[in-house]
Amino acid sequence: MISFALNGEPVHLDLDPTTRLTEALRETLGRKGTKVGCDAGDCGACTVMLDGAQVCACLVPVGRVAGRQVETVESPAPDLDRLKRAFLRHGAAQCGICTPGMLMAGVDLLRRTPRPTEAEVQDALGGVLCRCTGYRKIISAICDVDEAPTGPVADGAIGQSLPRLDGAAKVAGDNFGADEAPEGSLLLAAIRSPHPHAAFRFGDLAAYAARPGVAGVFTAADIPGRNLFGAIPPFADQPALAESPARFRGECVALVAFEPGTDPDTAGFPITWEPLEALITPAEAEAQGAPRLHASRPDNRLIEGQVIKGDSHRALEEAAHVIEGHMQTSFVEHAYIEPEAGSAWMEDGVLVIRACTQAPVMDRDETAAVLGLPADRLRIIPSAVGGGFGSKLDVSLQPLLGLVTLKTGRPCRMIYSRAESMASTTKRHPAEMTGRIGCDATGRIVALEFDGRFNTGAYASWGPTVANRVPVHVSGPYRTPHVTARARAVHTHGPISGAFRGFGVPQAALWQETIYDRLAEKVGL
């Protein structure tokens, strides 16, 4: 028996002493305010106080807190409450997933240094990452914790800052995807491809499903509807559960549902992999004779977009100055702190799925098609989103949750690990961009030519939007009389590329502004 004080109250737990403190708090004690972002001590979302000092709860075995004092964001301590009110006053919680950790780090500092400098606040928050805010309002809230609330300068909304409608929930650490699930929910674990391109075959799934603690095994053969989804319906091409072959590392090919309280260990799952030739770069994918990822897309091209205005070739031939340039950008991970998470259950004949999402109506339509349900028999409840930045516009675990609840009649839940989230979700499109820009003798732009090749990965996602939007925006905010701009999205066996704040325009802007700078230097501006 492990005994300790939690927020001033005695707690007694019969747990393996190596159990993470985060698991003990969240799963055994139901204290969901402490968040799990990485399970590796990197993000600090799980920061709690242990004997008055901040620690990452994901790195602390529960056996090490025996006889000690643990304080979490649920603590009734007056100074913590005061700091929460300061966070609300300053609007310091944006997505909110890091807020409980920030509050604990802030309280730790304020108890040692009641009137800290900004530099001291920055140092105290060094172990807690925030992906959204830039830290300004968080720092201000801690520095101004004792500041009296400023009264409104006018009646109504005009002239005053309005409190966030969801602010209280965010400072309490409530309402995220991993925080709620019906009692007795099955826990889902995904079987994912360890290869960028591989054929696979299953062994004796029935024998595996008969193992103690396993409630069921599910593959593409169990999907009752159309095993395809996509953010843009005419381009839908991604299976909820892949049929051989898997087209990218991290693709889900099967699900295992475990009974509650069971260790969701998929070791020994009966599957055999046969690695196949992988097309990693767009150049490889467009090479003559390269195998197609999708039979209906020659040269592995998803789509091409273009904008043509005037006669750019002639204008550049006549231009006083011309600069050519080539640039490459890489995949970029969205790096939200909250991994994908959600739960599903039946309610009065309606399948209910609660998950972190940026697009609940799109989720409903895509998931209903996969599960063969009319839209009025499926409800999507969006939880708070602990960072999204475009990636959570795409469906992730919603069809998986729905499938298991439909097949078993039981509620279920699923929480991606950090590694799963980074492997299986969308990224910013890598780009290869070439072109030239010309101006007259006075430096006035006369023409632009641009060709962009964007690595859209194994499936379409938002690739069509990127390929069509880039040619429209590549000339930037500058008057350009003659433009020829083309972009194409190319399939590879890399991660799926999707929406990420700008739909390809930031990549094009890097190229464009660099060329403009070089052109300005040449002209002497």
Describe these PLM feature segments:
Residues 27-30, 226-228, 317-332, 414-421:
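Short Pro/Gly-enriched beta-strand edge/turn motifs at strand-loop
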Residues 91, 160, 166-172, 300-342, ...:
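Glycine-rich loop/linker segments at domain edges
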Residues 1-157:
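Signature of N-terminal electron-transfer/Fe-S-associated modules in redox systems
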Residues 146-303:
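Flexible, low-hydrophobicity surface segments
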Residues 102, 111, 189-220, 254-273, ...:
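Alpha-helical support elements that line or immediately flank enzyme active sites
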Residues 64, 76, 223, 357-360, ...:
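Acidic, glycine-rich active-site loops and adjacent beta-strand->loop/helix elements
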Residues 142-143, 155, 172, 234-258, ...:
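Glycine-rich and small/hydrophobic secondary-structure elements
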